[in-house]
């Protein structure tokens, strides 16, 4: 078993050719939340992944194995609920309201400009439909937000120092 104990978030600093040549490992959200797991990469190698506790892997992250080889993490498609505003009876604000209610329930949620994604839950699906949202089951990669205390694990904000807004 090949030991992996180093993570390069989103492959930052690596040449694109290195990211493209790397073997891949496909993991769903449940597995990407674990800091210790076994997996098999696209080259058929057994991997023992041992990362610092609390580490969450994201699609596009690069793992460095003990032999120096690189493994690119892929967010594998998994069952999700796709939530969107009803074009006839709703408004884009309905998604904001849905995100608020889901956040109050501490539900892992992927935020997109025109839709939300959550893991399947029939009770939440009924609640969202009652809010006049369209809820569809699908099989897609799931990349939920890291949350307020995720130490940079969330999507879109980037590492500190690479943005220009003032801090008060």
From Swiss-Prot:
CDD domains the UniProt entry points to: UreE
Keywords per UniProt: Chaperone, Cytoplasm, Nickel, Nickel insertion
Record's GO cellular component terms: cytoplasm
Main location per the UniProt record: cytoplasm
Cellular localization per UniProt: Cytoplasm
Chain residue ranges for the region called Disordered: 145-168
SMART domains per UniProt: UreE_N (SM00988)
Biological process according to GO: protein folding; protein-containing complex assembly; urea metabolic process
GO molecular function, one term: unfolded protein binding
InterPro entries reported for this sequence: UreE, UreE_C_dom, UreE_N, UreE_N_sf
Superkingdom: Bacteria
Keyword Chaperone among record annotations: yes
Pfam family, one: UreE_C
Protein family: Belongs to the UreE family.
Described function: Involved in urease metallocenter assembly. Binds nickel. Probably functions as a nickel donor during metallocenter assembly.
NCBIfam families assigned: PRK13261.1-1, PRK13263.1
Protein name: Urease accessory protein UreE
Organism annotation: Verminephrobacter eiseniae (strain EF01-2)
Gene (name only): ureE
